[in-house]
Amino acid sequence: MNCQSGLRWLVTLCAFFQVGSARDTHESTRQCDKPVSQKDMNSFLWTVKRPRPFPPSYLFGTIHVPYTRVWDYIPESSKRAFQTSNSVFFELDLTDPLTISKLTSCQLLPNGENLQTLLPRDLYRRLKRHLDYVKHMMPFWMTADQRGRGLYADYLFNAIAGNWERKRPVWVMLMVNSLTEADVRSRGTPVLDLFLAQEAERLGKQTGAVERVEEQCHPLNGLNFSQVLFALNQTLLQHESLRAGILQGTFTTEDLIAHYNCGDLNSIIFNHDTSQLPHFINSSLPDHERLTAQQIDSYLRQELIYKRNERMARRVSALLQRNPNQSFFFAFGAGHFLGNHSVLDILRQEGYEVEHTPPQEPIIQSWSEREATTLNPTEDSFESVTEWTSETPELEEISQEELSHMLLPDSLSQLEEFGRYKHPRKTHHTHSRPRLFSDLWVRIGDSTTPHPSIRITNGYVTVEPPQIRQEQQQRLRERLKPLSEPTNPSALDSAAPNPTYALTCFLACLISQLLFAS
């Protein structure tokens, strides 16, 4: 289902989700009653049907809120589709610590620069004043449950705003948007995307991503300096107005949760994802500032919606084509499946049969799906993300679309928290075929360098240089030469080769070569 055609991509400046008080957050929003039956639930699941015997795959829309706020409202059909799928793919690989390090480095200013020397003095002072206010308010914003779980205000502040003076201004702007009472109260619980990633890993499913970190980072870093200063200034003005009680947010995180749990798929709020980018267009702006706001909105709409939807749909299609026997579960932000030129639209244009899955519809694991679970991964290997090109054709501007869900810095501390428990890194292969055991023999056979001598004594590994090894072997042969020469013909006849000894020597040589190669 698509958004109503009359919806605009951006709303006015006051259509901003952050609110300055708990009263606005908790009392002015509609709460959902838990549905009585499955058919009363809201389904954000779409099925990609394929001809038999190939199994179906699924597209699931998420929102960036603590999973505990929405999990009980997600239909069993969506949960069943997740459980029966062989592979689960996200926008980014949330289980890979490399994702965290790349997100962090992408946000930092180059060459050791800092905001104090980069920003105009007045703007820097206002920013620091606002962050000092947030740090002061953090203990009062935290919930009793958070304090009971051992979370501290200073820890939360540093998790979100740590090292802020070294970050690029555009990322500081987004950081400011995540330093609100509503967001602080939600910290400590994995958001829905991250929870699904953790569950997929716990269940031993194949996980992956359809985007690279750079593809989400670079468009934001592509704004010019004057545009970034304008955006940061407008963001601070909004929050300063909220603090002063002059401005109140229209769309709140609570509104987003309520619409996800019991709203309808045509709601504007999913494309106005409230945990993400602020909106700057305001009729009260002077003409030159309104033009700057429109340029920023147009740029972000093109880079963060149309190009991403095109890229994500193309990579979903590639995975389905390369792995016809696999059942996939793609969990993306709900905004990517709503509105014009969505991921669903693009897949349908490519010939896929994509249908919305009602909440009461059963998900049955067919024989083909059970068979797919035994496939050799080397036969149906996934296309490496590093092999995908980030170039996408320019899309026509569509005026009736809004910013989609995007994993941005308000989730970075959640990723960092998860990443601390992920010591081993995933192996990133750049080759196009699986490595064979015969490759090892090719490398050994082609080598012209003498191999070192490797010994394991009492659990310790010692390596001797090749030249020393050759000298020792030569001395050993000289000592054994008199013993090996027969003294009479009868001795020569009795010197039959011992097959057990020969096999032992061969195995010892093989093990030493393998140890060297590894």
From Swiss-Prot:
CDD domains: Tiki. Keywords: Cell membrane, Glycoprotein, Hydrolase, Membrane, Metal-binding, Metalloprotease, Protease, Signal, Transmembrane, Transmembrane helix, Wnt signaling pathway. Pfam families: TraB_PrgY_gumN (PF01963). The keyword Hydrolase applies. One of its GO terms (biological process) is Wnt signaling pathway. Its main location: membrane. Its cofactor is Mn(2+); Co(2+). Residues 518 are cytoplasmic. Divalent metal cations. Mn(2+) or Co(2+). Residues 23-499 are extracellular. The keyword Hydrolase applies. One of its GO terms (molecular function) is metal ion binding. It is a single-pass type I membrane protein. Glycans are attached at residues 224, 233, 282, 325, 340. Belongs to the TIKI family. This is Metalloprotease TIKI2. It comes from Danio rerio. The gene is trabd2b.
